[in-house]
Curated annotation (Swiss-Prot):
Testis-specific spindle-associated factor that plays a role in spermatogenesis. In association with HSPA2, participates in the maintenance of spindle integrity during meiosis in male germ cells. It is found in: Cytoplasm, Cytoskeleton, Spindle. The keyword Signal does not apply. The modification Phosphoserine is found at S8, S53. Residues 46-56 have a biased composition (Low complexity). Interacts with HSPA2; this interaction may promote the recruitment of HSPA2 to the spindle. Residues 28-41 have a biased composition (Polar residues). Expressed in spermatocytes and elongating spermatids inside the seminiferous tubules (at protein level). Testis-specific. This is Testicular spindle-associated protein SHCBP1L. The modification N6-acetyllysine is found at K570, K645. The lineage of its organism: Eukaryota, Metazoa, Chordata, Craniata, Vertebrata. GO terms for cellular component: cytoplasm; meiotic spindle.
Length: 653
């Protein structure tokens, strides 16, 4: 637990790379994003004191008894909880020797130039300059040669060795020690074989500097001695203030880190691939789509977690196999197969992400596996009242022959619904996992002001409201998205109506998938990370008297890459859209964007320009009019204003 302010560190701060392809040699390192995050402003990395138990090191008297705890600052020590106090009782805190000076703060490392590269620059760097026409099985050798050529520029330089805390400590709080950083002097020597290609010789530089103020100098010396002063090269980050050659080396290291972090897959050299650089380009495009928001943040998080889980599972399997001394027992063989098939499953998911045709929408498979119930056997419909207590006042507007059923929560009400039923919700705040499983034709409506009937998503779930019912209607409600990764509302098939609703998005907006239909009237959509309403090829939507605003709230360094805003249409086959009396404003992309493949765009554009346009500035308007005709897009009396990129635009892909 840190005593000072905590640095912001991503959840995937540590990675496991396998530079020898099949994972025979694996090394842990801190991700490039973490390194950049700590030095982006060009200041020294904050130094802090922590509580941790040093790892016992062999070969020196007294090391086995060196399991003392590093002393924390007194102020933070006074804030210990009962749990921490119990831990301290088991193993008392021992102070660092008084004559031992605290480590100095680490100097800033070279800021990553990779972060500022455009998509085309990254593709050119990896495909044309580094990998060229190499095959997947040769990628390791090519990356090694590229790095060794750059390292010839300078044989000695200063860097920060950033490694997993487990190298130094057996006990530590992960939140307080994201990595252990030590200022070292690096000596570059030509590698003798493939196993030493990603290793480098280091020694502690003066003055002794670390991100952990009270780490003992002796402990660092002992760890390095045990490692024979050889550490993974990709764990070393050159520091600022050296000559220009160091910046070339720093970029080369970042290029190789990014390759193993994001572009390399362990299965690459196990499968035939005619054009490996084309595959690398596709992965670069995937990464850029995540960064610029084409793939919304919450959905991108799913991919990152899947990739991280795949890497971890692969390392687990390698470690498990290496611990089997002789012929495996039946139980060990079963466990190996279990771990192997987990890896195969994750591998399949990652391949789906890399295929543009398969990653059209988040999870790649239907979200609803529940079958339709249909109507009740006796043919009657029931009105479900959702309220903790029910009074006669609540049902005074219902006819005397209405069959009623009262429920304490919305989930239970939805679980008891059959086609034709109505769910009435009174003011309050609700959650319902069953909203993501709408298969029957029901009406869900609030009674009272729509702002007072709040339905929030469960952050632990992927989806919020998902429907494949033939005809489902939501009325007079507020849907508030919290943490779910899919669209706030996803219409998989059938028809959904949203009437007088407020949709406060946190992930993507309303998604209408191929073949589905949506009608939205008198509603408000705001806060989506992508478009407020997204129409997939072959879908149908009618929007009337709605407000769609402040969508495409993406944190991206390249805002010009993100065009989505109020309404986005994906064509081929063309969706159908009718918009009447809507107000679309203050979106960061366009008010309405039409996403059309490049070849089809030029066909339509050429026809529009040759046949419909007269001259001058009218060409763009005529072309847009022609495209809108071809797309079956009808727009009447809409107010589209104050959108950052413009009102309406054809975007090519």
């Amino acid at each position: 637990m840190a005593s000072g302010s905590k640095a912001s560190v991503p959840a995937d701060s540590f990675r496991t790379i396998s530079p020898d392809r099949r994972g025979e040699k694996s090394a842990s390192a801190v991700s490039g994003d973490t390194a950049a995050a700590t030095t982006l402003k060009g200041t020294a990395i904050p130094v802090r004191s922590v509580v941790a138990s040093p790892r016992p090191v062999k070969g020196k008297a007294g090391r086995e008894t060196a399991r003392l705890r590093l002393q924390r600052l007194p102020a933070a020590q006074a804030e210990d909880t009962g749990e921490a106090a119990a831990a301290a009782a088991e193993e008392p805190l021992l102070p660092v020797p008084e004559d031992e000076e605290e480590a100095q703060p680490l100097p800033p490392v070279c800021v990553s130039r990779m972060r500022g590269m455009w998509r085309d620059e990254k593709v050119s760097l990896y495909c044309d300059e580094v990998l060229q026409d190499c095959k997947a099985e040769d990628a390791d050798e090519v990356m090694g040669k590229y790095l060794s050529e750059k390292l010839k520029l300078k044989d000695k330089w200063l860097g920060v060795w950033k490694t997993n805390p487990s190298v130094f400590f057996v006990k530590y709080e992960e939140a307080s020690i994201p990595f252990v950083g030590i200022l070292v002097e690096v000596t570059c020597e030509p590698y003798q074989d493939s196993s030493s290609r990603f290793k480098v010789t280091v020694s502690v530089a003066e003055p002794f500097s670390s991100n952990i103020a009270n780490i003992p100098r002796d402990l660092v010396d002992e760890i390095l001695e045990e490692l024979e002063h050889s550490v993974p090269l990709l764990e070393v980050y050159p520091v600022e203030g050296q000559d220009t050659d160091i910046h070339v080396i720093a970029l080369a290291l970042e290029v190789v880190r990014f390759f193993y972090d994001f572009l390399w897959r362990d299965w690459d050299d196990e499968e035939s691939c005619e054009n490996y650089t084309a595959l690398i380009e596709e992965r670069i495009n995937l990464w850029c789509d995540i960064q610029d928001g084409t793939i919304p943040g919450p959905i991108a998080q799913r991919f990152k977690k899947t990739l991280e889980k795949y890497k971890n599972k692969r390392v687990e399997l390698i470690e498990y196999q290496s611990n089997i001394k002789e012929d495996p027992s039946a139980a060990e063989a079963v466990e190996c197969w279990k771990k192997y098939y987990e890896i195969v499953m994750l591998c399949g998911l990652l391949k789906m992400w890399e295929d543009l045709r398969l990653r059209v929408h988040g999870p790649f498979f239907p979200r609803i596996l529940r079958r339709r119930k249909g109507k009740r056997e006796f043919g009657k419909t029931i009105t479900h009242i959702v309220a903790k207590m029910m009074t006669t006042e609540m049902i005074k507007d219902l006819s005397s022959d209405t069959l009623l059923q009262q429920h304490g929560d919305l989930d239970l009400a939805l679980d008891n619904c059959y086609s034709g039923d109505t769910v009435i919700i009174f003011p309050g705040e609700y959650q319902a996992a069953n909203l993501a499983l709408l298969t029957d034709d029901i009406i869900i409506k609030g009674v009272g002001k729509r702002e007072e009937i709040m339905i929030t998503s469960e952050p632990s779930r992927d989806s919020f409201v998902v429907s494949k019912a033939d005809n489902v209607k939501l009325m007079h409600l507020s849907l508030i998205q919290q943490g779910t990764v899919d669209g706030i509302v996803v219409v998989e098939s059938g028809h959904m109506t949203l009437e007088n609703c407020i949709l406060k998005c946190e992930g993507t907006g309303v998604c209408v998938l191929t073949g589905a239909a949506l009608t939205i009237t008198d509603s408000e959509i705001t806060g989506a990370q992508g478009a407020g309403v997204e129409l997939y090829p072959g879908s149908i939507a009618i929007l009337e008297r709605n407000e769609i605003h402040h969508c495409n709230n993406l944190r991206t360094s390249n805002s010009s890459k993100s065009t989505l805003g109020g309404v986005n249409m994906k064509v081929l086959p063309a969706p159908k859209l009718k918009m009447t009396n809507n107000h679309i404003y203050s979106n960061k992309g366009y008010g309405v964007s039409i996403l059309q493949p490049m070849e089809q765009f030029f066909i339509v554009a050429e026809e529009a320009l040759n046949k419909r346009a007269s001259s001058g500035d009218k060409k763009d308007d005529k072309m847009l009019f022609k495209v809108m005709q071809n797309l079956n897009l009808e727009m009447n009396n809409n107010k589209i204003e104050a959108n950052v990129k413009g009102d309406i635009r054809i975007v090519t892909s």
